[in-house]
Amino acid sequence: MQAISLTPALVGVLRFLARNPGATQRELAEAIGMPPSRLVAMADELERRGLVHRVRDEQDRRSHRITLTAAGEAELAVIGREAREHKSELLKALSAEEQNQLADLLQRIAAQQGLRPGIHPGLSRPSSGERSELLRKR
């Protein structure tokens, strides 16, 4: 596995933008639960790295819309592969039933903490394909 050079918060921004292309900075800040002023610094960092592109909103010139660049999409794909490999390695000591129990418990904790799937990195149920892949590797 290669080292990922983005913080979990930056990965969360990329994940949100992959599902919501063209979201405004305000929409993004609300979705991930952070002040818009802090999000601007994160968007600046992602733009500096060439992972996102910001443009002024045509209807509201005070707003900026953010989209992933091709480099951002590629980085997110690499992060996804790395995360799946890491998860597979981490969970290989558990049976499929134990993995499901762990996922259920972690989902309950995440819900209690207000974390949202698709934004907070790693917060998602494994798909049936991922579960099958994990079982094949055992």
Task: Indicate residue ranges for each PLM-predicted region.
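Terminal low-complexity, poorly structured segments
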Residues: 6, 35, 72, 101, ...
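Charged, amphipathic alpha-helical coiled-coil/dimerization segments
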Residues: 22, 44-107, 111
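C-terminal regulatory/oligomerization modules of transcriptional regulators
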Residues: 97-138
